Each structure stands twice: as structure tokens, then as C-alpha cells.
From Swiss-Prot:
This is Large ribosomal subunit protein eL24. CDD domains: Ribosomal_L24e_L24. It comes from Saccharolobus solfataricus (strain ATCC 35092 / DSM 1617 / JCM 11322 / P2) (Sulfolobus solfataricus). The gene is rpl24e. The keyword Ribonucleoprotein applies. Keywords: Metal-binding, Ribonucleoprotein, Ribosomal protein, RNA-binding, rRNA-binding, Zinc, Zinc-finger.
Amino acid sequence: MPTTRQCSFCGHEIPPGTGLMYVRNDGTILWFCSSKCRKSMLKYHRDPKKYKWTTRYMKVR
């Protein structure tokens, strides 16, 4: 039975058969639910704690 994965950027669950697996040169495996999450992490180096649409969002105050 396929397992559900968790997005490395936003933290949402990824259903089996969807999403993208990205493998870095050091062997680290990153799972992304959308191109929005992939670009935010890899291209723009954004911090997921600063965006309300992620489950990792933390209010500063």
C-alpha cells in the first residue's frame, strides 16, 4: 500500500501518485506537493514560518 508523504515546505499531506520527489546532491530527499512549494524552497529560499498558507506558520506576536 502506498504511503502518504508530507510536503517539505508547507507541511500538507501529499496523496499517493501526486507530488514531486527532489533528491539533492548530498542524498537528502525532499517531497513537494506543488510547484509553488518547490520554487519557494529551492529557487527563492523562503522561510515557511513566514507564510500563512503553510502549516508551519508561526505568529511572531
